[in-house]
Curated annotation (Swiss-Prot):
GO terms for cellular component: cytosolic large ribosomal subunit. This is Large ribosomal subunit protein uL22. Part of the 50S ribosomal subunit. InterPro entries: Ribosomal_uL22 (IPR001063), Ribosomal_uL22_bac/chlpt-type (IPR005727), Ribosomal_uL22_bac/org-type (IPR047867), Ribosomal_uL22_CS (IPR018260), Ribosomal_uL22_sf (IPR036394).
Length: 110
């Protein structure tokens, strides 16, 4: 049984979120939650929310036991980029890219 949860349009770049996702892939759910709880990265908070949601989905929809769940797959895809302008000296302007990402977590029983 596999259960998934998604967070779409998360306000972090996919590159930064993938650093966190790579740390928990394939781990038991309890160990993954510990790692995410104590990680100093902003993306860890977002990934933890999605993991909690996937666990709740498995419990509620499939009747799964939390102790037997592991992180089956975690992947982060790029979302749309918001483009903004930053005024600079002498009438110039720089483009600011505010990147978003789509975080997907799949939990499966061992």
């Amino acid at each position: 049984m596999e259960v998934l949860a998604k967070h779409r349009f998360a306000r972090t770049s996919a590159q930064k979120a993938r650093l966190v996702a790579d740390q928990i892939r394939g781990l038991p759910v309890s160990k993954a939650l510990e790692i995410l709880t104590f990680s100093p990265k902003k993306a860890a908070v977002l990934v933890k929310k999605v993991l909690d949601s996937a666990i709740a989905n498995a419990e509620h929809n499939e009747g799964a036991d939390i102790d037997e769940l592991k992180v089956g797959a975690v992947f982060v895809d790029e979302g749309p980029t918001m483009k903004r302008i930053m005024p600079r000296a002498k009438g110039r302007a720089d483009r600011i890219m505010k990147r978003t990402s789509h975080i997907t977590v799949v939990v499966a029983d061992r």
